[in-house]
């Protein structure tokens, strides 16, 4: 059965049982009708996914892998902050009349910085180090740039990736691991979406650097379930986990910038029905 499902169920039960409520407090998020969007939250949630064992897509409900990869590449490959370059409309609420979300997410990825080796943006620096200095303990990205926060329509939720390379005993191939740091997460709408995105990213980076994907560690400072999501979460975690899907990444792609969503597939992906009409706090 899917290990990712069990991790998700345990996390949700922990939040519902041991979390704290923001009801009655001053909160920024609200529902479309103007009502404050309160949460039950848990501080410092850490989940670990061994990508060598399975791809961590939930079977409790379907995760739209093409759409989440499209968004991942929008940020990491296109380095864009314009929602018109996305196939989905997830970000429309935070875009201005021109489609821009300001100096957030992809904008920060395309900013070049001076290094001893020359000018590079954060993505190219990671790829350079993974190929030239894989055992460096300094391979990371960070898009939570304080001087630009006032020009971001949405502060980054998933804001930092740290990459770490190991070598298993008896193996000639290096293993690429990663830590995803997230300041805040809406568990129902975004948890598995983000997990699948960064699992794909690790697989992509590993492939183009001649490595194999290892462990993804997901650190969430504020993991929360919104008040109007509680019955939906309870329904979701009552379902029986199914076998994890098989992950396919086009082996012909050797350059990260050549990947498209069509180069990613989940095979034998059997899931429970989707939960529809999920209210989204803004």
Question: Where do the protein language model's features map onto the residues?
Answer:
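Terminal, non-catalytic protein-protein interaction segments that mediate quaternary/complex assembly
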Residues: 1-282
């Amino acid at each position: 059965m899917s290990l990712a499902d069990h991790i998700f169920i345990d996390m949700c039960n922990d939040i519902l049982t041991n979390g704290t409520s923001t009801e009655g407090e001053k909160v920024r998020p609200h529902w479309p009708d103007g009502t404050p969007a309160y949460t039950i939250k848990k501080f410092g949630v850490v989940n670990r996914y061994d990508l060598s064992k399975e791809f961590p897509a939930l079977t409790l409900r379907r995760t739209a892998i093409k759409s989440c990869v499209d968004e991942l590449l929008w940020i990491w490959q296109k380095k864009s902050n314009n929602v018109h370059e996305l196939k989905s409309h997830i970000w429309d609420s935070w875009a201005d009349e021109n489609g821009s979300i300001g100096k957030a997410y992809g904008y920060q990825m395309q900013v070049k910085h001076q290094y001893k080796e020359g000018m590079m943006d954060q993505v190219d620096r990671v790829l350079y180090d993974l190929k030239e200095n894989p055992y460096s303990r300094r391979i990371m990205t960070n898009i939570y740039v304080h001087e630009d926060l006032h020009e971001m329509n949405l502060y980054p939720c998933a804001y930092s990736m740290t990459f770490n390379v190991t070598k298993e005993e008896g193996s000639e191939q290096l293993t690429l691991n990663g830590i995803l740091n997230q300041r805040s997460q809406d568990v129902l709408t975004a948890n598995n979406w983000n997990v699948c995105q960064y699992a794909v990213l690790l697989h992509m980076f590993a492939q183009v650097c001649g490595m194999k994907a290892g462990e993804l560690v997901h650190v969430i400072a504020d993991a929360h379930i919104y008040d109007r999501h509680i019955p939906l979460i309870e329904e979701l975690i009552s379902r029986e986990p199914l076998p994890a899907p098989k992950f396919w990444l086009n082996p012909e792609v050797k350059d990260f910038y050549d990947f498209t969503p069509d180069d990613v597939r989940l095979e034998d992906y059997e899931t429970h029905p989707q939960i529809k009409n999920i209210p989204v706090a803004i």
